């Protein structure tokens, strides 16, 4: 698989700036010759706005519903996302799990729906700080793997330690590797990316971890300059 760099814009930005950001980012990536796939996951309203702005950038979404259609006010199906040009969809992000009480089983249903619609789900899992401090890291990760992952189809695993999301704190390389080893004991084939406080300063250390296929970037993806620095940094490490 190509080096995968995913931007999760969460609920930031506005309709006027989405396309200009995408065009500027695309122009900055013209000279990147490495085998890298850049994915933008904007708010739903921007999906149709940016899909044609940059042929060298893939479009993703931040969530989907597990039914393909029906009387589900306010929901967006994976089939709809595919029809507007999405290639990926994030499911199971901790903010969805904690704020909207999405269970592992709900995440699995969403992932299955995404696969059936022709999308590649990016399934987020990760431990809390309490899990790690109480010696429950392995149980926490394996429970999420078993209950969140579909049994068939292609998907990407996003390892995001809950305590690193939205912070300036990133786990040590040894801590990340320990978690990846646990995940790999359950799934030896799917690509794994890392998310949680990824920025220009730590990208080279993170992407140098052999088991990783890329990164999921939050706040540092909201500015073209910082996001490009992350992409360039990751590419440079993988090319050397």
Swiss-Prot record:
Per the record, its GO cellular-component terms are: cytosol
Q: Which family does it belong to?
A: Belongs to the triosephosphate isomerase family.
Matching entries from Gene3D superfamilies are given as: Aldolase class I
Q: What is its EC number?
A: 5.3.1.1
InterPro entries for the chain: Aldolase_TIM, TIM_sf, TrioseP_Isoase_bac/euk, Triosephosphate_isomerase, Triosephosphate_isomerase_AS
GO molecular function ontology, one term from the record: triose-phosphate isomerase activity
Report the record's Gene Ontology biological process terms.
gluconeogenesis; glyceraldehyde-3-phosphate biosynthetic process; glycerol catabolic process; glycolytic process
N-terminal signal peptide = none
UniProt binding sites for substrate: 8-10, 166
Positions annotated as active site in the UniProt record: 93 (electrophile), 160 (proton acceptor)
Job description of the protein: Involved in the gluconeogenesis. Catalyzes stereospecifically the conversion of dihydroxyacetone phosphate (DHAP) to D-glyceraldehyde-3-phosphate (G3P).
Q: What class of enzyme is it?
A: isomerase
* Reactions mediated catalytically: D-glyceraldehyde 3-phosphate = dihydroxyacetone phosphate
Which protein are we looking at?
A: Triosephosphate isomerase
Subunit comment for this entry? Homodimer.
User: What is the annotated localization of this protein?
Assistant: Cytoplasm
Q: Give the UniProt keywords, A-Z.
A: Cytoplasm, Gluconeogenesis, Glycolysis, Isomerase
Major localization listed first in the record, in broad terms: cytoplasm
Pathway field of the UniProt record reads:
Carbohydrate biosynthesis; gluconeogenesis; Carbohydrate degradation; glycolysis; D-glyceraldehyde 3-phosphate from glycerone phosphate: step 1/1
């Amino acid at each position: 698989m190509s080096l995968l760099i995913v931007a999760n814009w969460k609920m930031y930005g506005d309709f006027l700036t989405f396309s200009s950001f995408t065009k500027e980012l695309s122009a900055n990536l013209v000279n990147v010759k490495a085998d890298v796939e850049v994915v933008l996951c904007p708010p739903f309203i921007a999906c149709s706005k940016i899909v044609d702005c940059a042929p060298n950038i893939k479009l993703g979404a931040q969530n989907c519903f597990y039914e393909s259609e029906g009387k589900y006010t306010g929901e967006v199906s994976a089939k709809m996302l595919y029809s507007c040009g999405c290639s990926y969809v994030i499911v199971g992000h901790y903010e969805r799990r904690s704020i909207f009480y999405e269970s592992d089983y709900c995440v699995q249903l969403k992932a299955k729906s995404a696969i059936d619609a022709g999308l590649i789900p990016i399934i987020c899992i990760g431990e809390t700080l309490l899990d790690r401090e109480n010696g429950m890291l392995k149980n926490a990760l394996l429970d999420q793997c078993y209950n969140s992952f579909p049994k068939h189809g292609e998907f990407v695993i996003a390892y995001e330690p809950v305590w690193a999301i939205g912070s300036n704190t990133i786990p040590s390389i040894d801590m990340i590797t320990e978690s990846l080893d646990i995940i790999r004991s359950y799934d030896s084939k799917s690509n794994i990316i890392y998310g949680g406080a990824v920025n220009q300063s730590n990208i080279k250390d993170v992407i140098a971890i052999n088991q990783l296929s890329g990164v999921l970037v939050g706040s540092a993806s909201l500015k073209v300059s910082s996001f490009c620095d992350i992409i360039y940094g990751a590419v440079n490490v993988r090319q050397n």
